[in-house]
Swiss-Prot record:
The gene is atpB. PROSITE patterns: ATPASE_ALPHA_BETA. It is found in: Plastid, Chloroplast thylakoid membrane. Belongs to the ATPase alpha/beta chains family. F-type ATPases have 2 components, CF(1) - the catalytic core - and CF(0) - the membrane proton channel. CF(1) has five subunits: alpha(3), beta(3), gamma(1), delta(1), epsilon(1). CF(0) has four main subunits: a(1), b(1), b'(1) and c(9-12). One of its GO terms (molecular function) is ATP hydrolysis activity. This is ATP synthase subunit beta, chloroplastic. It comes from the Eukaryota.
Amino acid sequence: MKNDSRTFGASTVLTKTQNIGRISQIIGPVLDVTFPPGKMPNIYNSLIVKGQNTAGQEINVTCEVQQLLGNNKVRAVAMSATDGLMRGMDVVDTGAALSVPVGEATLGRIFNVLGEPVDNLGPVDASTTFPIHRSAPAFTQLDTKLSIFETGIKVVDLLAPYRRGGKIGLFGGAGVGKTVLIMELINNIAKAHGGVSVFGGVGERTREGNDLYMEMKESKVINEENISESKVALVYGQMNEPPGARMRVGLTALTMAEYFRDVNKQDVLLFIDNIFRFVQAGSEVSALLGRMPSAVGYQPTLSTEMGTLQERITSTKEGSITSIQAVYVPADDLTDPAPATTFAHLDATTVLSRGLAAKGIYPAVDPLDSTSTMLQPWIVGEEHYETAQGVKETLQRYKELQDIIAILGLDELSEEDRLVVARARKIERFLSQPFFVAEVSTGSPGKYVSLAETIKGFQMILSGELDSFPEQAFYLVGNIDEATAKAANLQMEN
């Protein structure tokens, strides 16, 4: 044994009693390591390879044990590039799973999968660390109440409400407003619920991660002057990282969120962008470990891996983690095993529509395609349910009439249908809303609309009280009183 005492990563201190093995085989990001008899590390233990490559450069690679092969060998997956590693190099067993910093010190900072800051703002002053592999809360700790998580965004709260401690799938292509919607949710949970957010960038583009960070600084979600006032911690494992890092970065983000829920007893928003990349990384690792692939080439452990992550995202009696997960659907095939497995865990879906974005209606949430298991009369109440159904029926009828309008024009419709179209166009515009985080771009101040105000506004449109108002009065306003005031101003101008 080497007499060595150094500190590595977030929380692993290596001492005299080190358990040291040697690399016996390297296949890409997978290492086989031989340990002395009776000194085998456990599954999920963190191993550290330190040394120098042939060019004399320092090497520091963290790996995670995935398989015990027999003959005193383990197979581990590297969390960073394995360039420069050689057979025969010493590998130190840390004796514990990978641990990452948690707590207030993480807010406003960017971390990698190992919990190391990557934003050039110096070390993180975190006194507490948690292992990334933790069991889900016990059944007795779970909160069984079905309660709505109010976001202050009209279209979401009315038509596809989020469940407190639930999981929401966010569907949308490039450039339809996913990032702005995510930032508005982060802003609103901080202001209305006193909560914090954790953003896990899993296997997405580095450019997008950088853009998100810059936009968060611009909209003051991350406060550069006083970093402790920031509302979000960012954890990135992007496309260029090895599959081991992409597979575990979701767990790192979740572990940071669990601290705020379990210790600080807060409501937390956890964003995962993109949950499909988590599955994809698991599939790569599974193939590298030599497992027989399952349907469509995915890993045989797909459901287990997804379940292990998703079951930790829940409400307890102390606090909640509400998760919003961007879902990439490969080749738009909803029956593909990756999205199909994800759907089994979702409580609501928010679908962003390019058609609405093209009309300038933001947030471009599709009111007919977005769904929620919470939209039941015994959960949200009769009034909310009836209003939501009325809005959906009106919009659906308008959608059916659009072909006739395109060919024959509005004048050929019956009086009743013309009224439906007029109300639907008002509803469509009233579903738009100015965002706090977009103030910089739009110039109009953001609005948080309570659920009661939202229901009242749509009831007034459906009942015909506001039929005389011009439809532009409903565009990009908060509650219905603002629409009334805007209508009065428009009439004055005319």
